[in-house]
Each structure stands twice: as structure tokens, then as C-alpha cells.
């Protein structure tokens, strides 16, 4: 797969292009010229440069990484972390929203309910998934699956990655705000463990609608905010060009939200971001979720609900 590089990654892209060119030359000239040492030197230089660049990323750069077109989506994690996934469709009221995927699965043999936003890779898939922006029926499908999980005493695992809930007229007419509000209400009192993870964009109420849980985790280069940096800049400065300034001011990164005690854990990403090594990222996330599950499974239902309530009530009181 050809790697897409963001603007701030261009020095890395140039080094990798040099490495590929040397490898190509080496293959064609055979043993007459040994370029092994030069290639190794450039590969080491590339790793050092990548570590340096990624050691001091700003909020706007992290926001770009969270939206990277090759970043793993919910279905990528389902394929790597779970077995026996059985997708379920529809809200039993209006339609099946493809922006939300969900179903039963096994995590190391334990039955769980998996629910997440799903974006698309190519144009056709993006349209089918509505660019990862759920309509009310998507959130009602998620609610149906969560209530099913509660009946069968299965932990619920959600994967958050959306620019926000779809703001179209039809969605509003069918009760977008009510669907989100109902999810918040029900999730706060579910009698099974709920673990939520922001894997990319955590956009406003559209993210929060599947984001109330006993544990809320974020991947290292994901974001969580009430509005996009571009949206904030358009309101405050009447120009999306100030998005980088807005991103810094909004406190949208995992590190900042951890400081504010709005999330529980930050899941480290492979060097260069989750898209550089999806298998490694899936394994890191799986270990985080298994650790959380082991802790939550040991709690009595009353204790689980009490701790969840305390956590929700503590927000805003750092």
C-alpha cells in the first residue's frame, strides 16, 4: 500500500523516496555495486527523523493524523481483535445506517457486543457510510444492540470515529437530538461493563452518543471535541484558515483530555501513527481493552453503576 504523507511529514517522505530509489538501483545493478550500508544509514536516519517529528506534534498536526485517509477504522480493528463477529443491522423502526457497524463477537473467547462508527476508503464506500456521520437510525441501532448486550450480560465495546452526527434535514426530522440524548441516558445506567475508545475523530454529540462508559480511552493521535477546529475558527475568526490556532486553544488531544480527567487512558500508537502498522495498533488496543475488562468484570453491578455515576458527575471538577 502506498503511504499518504501529511504536509508536516514531507521530510520523511523525501527520505523514504531516496531509500526506495537506492533499493531499485541495487536490484538492477546486482552485485556490482553494494548499496546496503547506504540504505541502512538512510533507514536509521529516517527512524530518527520520524521520532523527532512525532515527539513534539501540535494539536493541529494531531487533528490531521486523526483524519488520515489510511487510518484504521472500526472494521479494521474488528478483523484483527475479535473472532466470530456477527454483524447486526437496522434500528427496527426506519432503516439500517451503514455509518454505524455493530454485532456480537468474541474477545479472547469472551462474548462481547462491538459497536463503532465506520467511514469509507473510496468515494463509493464513503457515500455508503455517509462519511462516518450517523443518522438517528444509526444511533437507534446502536441503542438496540446495547440493550441486547445488557439482556445477555455481554460487555459493550464502542469505537468512536466520526466528524459528528449527520446534520441533514431528514435526520433532524427523524429526531437526531432525541436519539443522541436517549443513548446518553441509557448508556449511563447499563448494567454491563462499557468501554469506549476514540480511534480517530471524536466529533461532538455524534461521538458522545456511543461514548458514555466505565472506561473512556483515546488513541495517542486521536481527537475529541465539541466542534472541529475549522468550525471553531469559522465562528471565532470568520475564517477556517485559523484552524491551527483553534485546535491549540480547544484542548482536543488525548494528552490534554487526560490532564482534564475527561478520559481514563491513552493507548500509544506505533511510530508514525496507527496507519503505519495496523496489526501492532490493534494488538496494543486489544491489550488495553482486556486490562479494562478484567477490572470491570470483577465489580458487582451496583459497584459498577456507582463508579460510572461518580465518574460522570466528576466531569468539570478537576
Curated annotation (Swiss-Prot):
It is an enzyme of class 2 (transferase). GO terms for molecular function: acetyl-CoA carboxylase activity; ATP binding; carboxyl- or carbamoyltransferase activity. It catalyses: N(6)-carboxybiotinyl-L-lysyl-[protein] + acetyl-CoA = N(6)-biotinyl-L-lysyl-[protein] + malonyl-CoA. This is Acetyl-coenzyme A carboxylase carboxyl transferase subunit alpha. It is found in: Cytoplasm. Component of the acetyl coenzyme A carboxylase (ACC) complex. First, biotin carboxylase catalyzes the carboxylation of biotin on its carrier protein (BCCP) and then the CO(2) group is transferred by the carboxyltransferase to acetyl-CoA to form malonyl-CoA. HAMAP family: AcetylCoA_CT_alpha. The gene is accA. Its EC number is 2.1.3.15. Pfam families: ACCA (PF03255). One of its GO terms (biological process) is malonyl-CoA biosynthetic process. It comes from the Bacteria. InterPro entries: Acetyl_CoA_COase_a_su, ClpP/crotonase-like_dom_sf, COA_CT_C. Pathway: Lipid metabolism; malonyl-CoA biosynthesis; malonyl-CoA from acetyl-CoA: step 1/1. Residues 41-295 form the CoA carboxyltransferase C-terminal domain. Acetyl-CoA carboxylase is a heterohexamer composed of biotin carboxyl carrier protein (AccB), biotin carboxylase (AccC) and two subunits each of ACCase subunit alpha (AccA) and ACCase subunit beta (AccD).
Amino acid at each position: 500500500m502506498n503511504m499518504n504523507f501529511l504536509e508536516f511529514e514531507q521530510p520523511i517522505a523525501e527520505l523514504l523516496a531516496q531509500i526506495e530509489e537506492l533499493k531499485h538501483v541495487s536490484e538492477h545493478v546486482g552485485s556490482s555495486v553494494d548499496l546496503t550500508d547506504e540504505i541502512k544509514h538512510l533507514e536509521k536516519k529516517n527512524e530518527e527523523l520520524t521520532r523527532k517529528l512525532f515527539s513534539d506534534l501540535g494539536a493541529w498536526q494531531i487533528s490531521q493524523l486523526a483524519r488520515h485517509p489510511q487510518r484504521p477504522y472500526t472494521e479494521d480493528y474488528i478483523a484483527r481483535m475479535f473472532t466470530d463477529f456477527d454483524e447486526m443491522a437496522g434500528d427496527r423502526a426506519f432503516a439500517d445506517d451503514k455509518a454505524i457497524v455493530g454485532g456480537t463477537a468474541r474477545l479472547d473467547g469472551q462474548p462481547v457486543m462491538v459497536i463503532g462508527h465506520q467511514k469509507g476508503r473510496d468515494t463509493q464506500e464513503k457515500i455508503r457510510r455517509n462519511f462516518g456521520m450517523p443518522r438517528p437510525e444509526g444511533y437507534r441501532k446502536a441503542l438496540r444492540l446495547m440493550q441486547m448486550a445488557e439482556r445477555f450480560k455481554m460487555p459493550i465495546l464502542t469505537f468512536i470515529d466520526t466528524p459528528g452526527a449527520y446534520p441533514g434535514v431528514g435526520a433532524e426530522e427523524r429526531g437526531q437530538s432525541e436519539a443522541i440524548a436517549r443513548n446518553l441516558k441509557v448508556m449511563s445506567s447499563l448494567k454491563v461493563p462499557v468501554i469506549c475508545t476514540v480511534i480517530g475523530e471524536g466529533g461532538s454529540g455524534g461521538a458522545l452518543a456511543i461514548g458514555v462508559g466505565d472506561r473512556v480511552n483515546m488513541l495517542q493521535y486521536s481527537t475529541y471535541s465539541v466542534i472541529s477546529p475549522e468550525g471553531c475558527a469559522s465562528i471565532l475568526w470568520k475564517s477556517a484558515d485559523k484552524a491551527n490556532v483553534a485546535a491549540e486553544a480547544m484542548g482536543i488531544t488525548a494528552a490534554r483530555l487526560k490532564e482534564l480527567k475527561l478520559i481514563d487512558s491513552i493507548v500509544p500508537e506505533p511510530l508514525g501513527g496507527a496507519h503505519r502498522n495496523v496489526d501492532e495498533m490493534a494488538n496494543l488496543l486489544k491489550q488495553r481493552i482486556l486490562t479494562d475488562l478484567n477490572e470491570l468484570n470483577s465489580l458487582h453491578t451496583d459497584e459498577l453503576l456507582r463508579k460510572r455515576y461518580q465518574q460522570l458527575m466528576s466531569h468539570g471538577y478537576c
